């Protein structure tokens, strides 16, 4: 009898010692009011938020601004984003053309007549020179037209280039200025027009030679064969 009661006593004492103790501040798990307060405390962040003086850093902004756009107005520049002073470049329109839609909408709202509307669209007929800013309208594939008299389209100081030369430099291969128009097959009409197959019409000092008659033997018919170059 005593031998069977001792193990039972040890089991009861061990279970009592291993049971978790409830602290004085711990709420009763069967209390409904305490359970509601625990659910409310779960929504409170365990750590306090950063002070407004230290809300900058990686991924942190100095101010909170919720917008539906991708970038803030102060950060609208970057790759593929240019502000209005930098809207020119390759494939970028000038500032004046960017404001075309706004001006057109304003005219539509004012209900102007058809004549004023047609005059407005005539200002933007030529879209070639509007692609770039006016000081940068020259380049590869962009040349100043000879028949174009508008100084606003292209700068006249840059109208030369590949295949385009100023009047001062319009000589070259097959092109010679009037003071340099002599050469192979090109002679001046005055004192340098003699040579291979070329003779002076007035001066007969160089009309003799192998197979060449002198000036005394030359007839009037032969003189008609000569012509000025």
Swiss-Prot record:
It is found in: Secreted. GO terms for biological process: neuropeptide signaling pathway. One of its GO terms (cellular component) is extracellular region. It comes from Agrotis ipsilon (Black cutworm moth). Its main location: secreted. Keywords: Amidation, Cleavage on pair of basic residues, Neuropeptide, Secreted, Signal. Allatostatin-A-1: Expressed in antennal lobe (AL), corpora cardiaca (CC), corpora allata (CA) and gnathal ganglion (GNG) (at protein level). Expression in AL and GNG detected in most animals, in CC and CA in some animals (at protein level). Allatostatin-A-3: Expressed in antennal lobe (AL), corpora cardiaca (CC), corpora allata (CA) and gnathal ganglion (GNG) (at protein level). Expression in AL detected in all animals, in GNG, CC and CA in most animals (at protein level). Neuropeptide inhibitors of juvenile hormone synthesis and gut muscle contraction. GO terms for molecular function: neuropeptide hormone activity. The modification Leucine amide is found at residues 58, 90, 140, 162, 173, 184, 196, 210. Residues 1-18 form the signal peptide. Pfam families: Allatostatin. Belongs to the allatostatin family. Residues 19-48, 62-80, 94-130, 144-152, 214-229 form a propeptide. It comes from the Eukaryota. The keyword Repeat does not apply. This is Allatostatin-A. Residues 23-46 are annotated as: Disordered.
């Amino acid at each position: 009898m005593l031998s069977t009661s001792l193990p039972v006593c040890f089991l009861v004492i061990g279970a009592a010692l291993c049971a978790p103790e409830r602290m004085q501040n711990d709420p009763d798990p069967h209390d409904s009011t305490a359970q509601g307060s625990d659910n409310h405390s779960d929504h409170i962040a365990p750590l306090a938020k950063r002070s407004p003086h230290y809300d900058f850093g990686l991924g942190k902004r100095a101010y909170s601004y919720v917008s539906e756009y991708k970038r803030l107005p102060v950060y609208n520049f970057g790759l593929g984003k240019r502000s209005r002073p930098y809207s020119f470049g390759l494939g970028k329109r000038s500032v004046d053309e960017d404001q075309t839609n706004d001006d057109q909408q304003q005219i539509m709202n004012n209900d102007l007549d058809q004549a004023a509307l047609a005059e407005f669209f005539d200002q933007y007929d030529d879209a070639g020179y509007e692609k770039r800013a006016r000081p940068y309208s020259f380049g590869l594939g962009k040349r100043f037209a000879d028949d174009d008299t508008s100084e606003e389209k292209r700068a006249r100081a840059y109208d030369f280039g590949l295949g385009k030369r100023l009047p001062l430099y319009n000589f070259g291969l097959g092109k010679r200025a009037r003071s340099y128009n002599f050469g192979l097959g090109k002679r001046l009409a005055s004192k340098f027009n003699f040579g291979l197959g070329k003779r002076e019409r007035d001066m007969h000092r160089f009309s003799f030679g192998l197979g060449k008659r002198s000036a005394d033997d030359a007839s009037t018919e032969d003189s008609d064969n000569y012509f000025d170059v």
